[in-house]
């Protein structure tokens, strides 16, 4: 039996309060809605009760953030792509962020289990004046549990429409990619943090954000496996590799908090779910 689960999530600003309305079909839904920062920023926890995907399963999320609204979405656990006997397992999100709106799309990691056949796809459309922060964290197997990613394929698609596109196909049997110094160098977790806008970022903001990120990277044990750059006038990136998930996640959380303060003058208070 395969699952097709859909969620439509719409944020709007009503007076000084951000509100959200959502519809779901199948096992994909909003578990909690919180205002830990006051009425202007709406935090949501997205859950998929089955806990993982196999061949033929699809999770489809459609998100709209209306003008002036600010939504933050996270998850209570990893997205697990299990062994696929037939067909592709797909998780996809398409988000539209309108002028003056902000979106923080911060799911926990995606785990590629041995013999998975998976696609993790995220597309973001940003209107002029819109801004967002997202990350993509991928764990290849579970090295600490001696469950390596020895066979299978994991596909990634991360796109800011008209601005930036990254696509990758990670084959477990591609030794040059998985283990060479020009590839993952034997690391089994990789993370990308993105700050993107619908208009060019002012040079002083870019410099401030990169300085913030680089200071944090330099102080990290992962400093030789991480970097910060601006590949496009509307995009800032931090990339990091680590042997397991926790160091990458911890470092990206630090930079996320720093960018929140530097770019939006908002505190980097983590969603309370992350402290459980």
Question: What are the residue ranges of the model-derived segments?
Answer:
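N-terminal, charged/glycine-rich beta-strand/loop interface patches
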Residues: 1-109, 114, 121, 261
């Amino acid at each position: 039996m395969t699952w097709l689960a859909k969620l439509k999530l719409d944020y709007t600003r009503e007076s000084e309060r951000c509100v959200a309305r959502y519809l779901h079909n199948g096992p994909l839904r909003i578990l909690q809605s919180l205002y830990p920062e006051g009425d202007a920023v709406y935090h949501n926890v997205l859950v998929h009760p089955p806990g993982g995907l196999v061949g033929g399963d699809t999770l489809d999320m459609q998100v709209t953030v209306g003008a002036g609204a600010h939504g933050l979405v996270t998850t209570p656990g990893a997205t697990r792509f299990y062994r696929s006997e037939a067909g592709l397992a797909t998780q996809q999100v398409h988000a539209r962020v309108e002028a003056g709106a902000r979106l923080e799309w911060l799911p926990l990691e995606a785990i590629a289990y041995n013999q998975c056949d998976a696609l993790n796809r995220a597309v973001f459309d940003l209107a002029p004046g819109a801004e967002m922060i997202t990350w993509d964290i991928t764990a290849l197997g579970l090295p600490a549990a001696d469950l390596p990613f020895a066979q299978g394929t994991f596909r990634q698609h991360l796109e800011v429409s008209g601005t930036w596109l990254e696509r990758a196909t990670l084959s477990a049997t591609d030794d040059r990619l998985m283990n060479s110094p020009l590839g993952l160098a034997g690391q089994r977790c990789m993370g990308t943090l993105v700050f993107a806008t619908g208009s060019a970022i002012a040079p002083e903001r870019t410099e401030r954000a990169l300085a913030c990120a680089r200071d944090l990277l330099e102080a990290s044990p992962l400093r030789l496996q991480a970097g910060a750059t601006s590949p496009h006038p509307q995009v800032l990136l931090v990339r990091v590799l680590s042997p397991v998930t926790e160091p990458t996640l911890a470092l990206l959380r630090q930079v996320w908090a720093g960018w929140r303060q530097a770019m939006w003058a908002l505190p980097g208070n983590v969603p309370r779910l992350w402290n459980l």
